[in-house]
Each structure stands twice: as structure tokens, then as C-alpha cells.
């Protein structure tokens, strides 16, 4: 009887942990695929950390006021394999990011594509469960 209780408790705990991990890695938990956004601005900082990279950028709104935005990218390993390094985006670099807004309305977005000043484009690699499948991610093909 005691063993049965321990097994049931352990199984329930594993289910809860699995749900939390799944929610963390779910695009749909944080970002809205129905709210695409294009941000033009300058890089203020890059966080080259696991599990996601973050590009911070200064973006001018319609009134000319500067807003700070945080763009979630893929893992450093994914971006390295696509040719981006932690020194590829020095502070002050002008970039364009296409992505999807945060559901909570904050100045955060999931980055889909990054366009450099010379016109080169890079898939930021931050897709995941619930992310729109638009064919730009080469792993979708």
C-alpha cells in the first residue's frame, strides 16, 4: 500500500514538472502568432545565454519616443551554426527584426528574421511549439 502511494505521488509530480517544462518551451504560451511585428532600431545589448539569446534594441515609436525592446532568439548554438556570433551585433548596429509580439503587451517579441544593414537576412531560430509555420525555418521543409 505504501509503495502504491509513493508511485502515484511520483507519477503525479512528474506530470506537473513535464507540464511546466512544456509551457516554458511553448511559443504559444508567450507570443501571439496573430500579432506579427517589424521593429527597426539599434542594438543596445546582446545576451548570449542559454536557453535563448536576447537582443535588446532601441526603437522609435510613431511619436519619435525611443522604446527599449527585447527580442528572443534561438539558442547560442543554433545561431552559431547559422553564422551569428556574440560579436556580430555590436552596440549601435541598425537592424530590422520581424517577429511576433508578446501576449502580455510588453515590449518583447519572438524574433523570426533579422535583417542586417547590408541586406543579409538570418532566421533567428526561435521557433517552437505553437510558432507559425511560414516556411522560413529550414527545419520546416
What are these regions (language model features)?
Residues 49-59:
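Short aromatic-glycine-enriched beta-strand elements
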Residues 9-19:
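Bacterial N-terminal signal peptides
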Residues 120-141:
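Extended, charge-rich, solvent-exposed interface segments
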Residues 81-97:
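Short nucleic-acid-contacting surface segments enriched for D/E, G, S/T with interspersed K/R
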Residues 1-11:
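Bacterial N-terminal signal peptides that target proteins for export
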Residues 41-43, 94:
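Conserved hydrophobic positions within beta-strands
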Residues 22-37:
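Short boundary/loop segments of OB/S1/cold-shock single-stranded nucleic-acid-binding domains
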Residues 102-126:
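OB-fold/S1-family single-stranded nucleic acid-binding modules
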Amino acid at each position: 500500500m505504501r509503495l502504491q502511494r509513493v508511485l502515484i505521488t511520483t507519477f503525479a509530480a512528474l506530470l506537473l514538472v513535464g507540464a511546466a517544462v512544456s509551457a516554458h518551451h511553448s511559443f504559444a504560451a508567450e507570443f501571439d502568432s496573430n500579432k506579427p511585428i517589424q521593429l527597426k532600431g539599434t542594438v543596445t545589448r546582446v545576451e548570449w545565454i542559454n536557453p535563448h539569446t536576447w537582443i535588446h534594441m532601441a526603437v522609435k515609436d510613431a511619436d519619435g519616443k525611443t522604446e527599449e525592446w527585447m527580442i528572443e532568439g534561438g539558442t547560442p548554438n543554433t545561431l552559431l551554426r547559422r553564422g551569428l556570433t556574440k560579436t556580430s551585433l555590436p552596440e549601435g548596429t541598425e537592424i530590422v527584426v520581424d517577429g511576433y509580439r508578446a501576449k502580455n503587451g510588453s515590449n518583447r517579441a519572438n524574433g523570426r528574421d533579422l535583417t542586417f544593414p547590408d541586406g543579409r537576412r538570418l532566421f533567428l531560430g526561435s521557433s517552437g511549439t505553437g510558432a507559425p509555420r511560414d516556411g522560413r525555418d529550414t527545419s520546416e521543409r
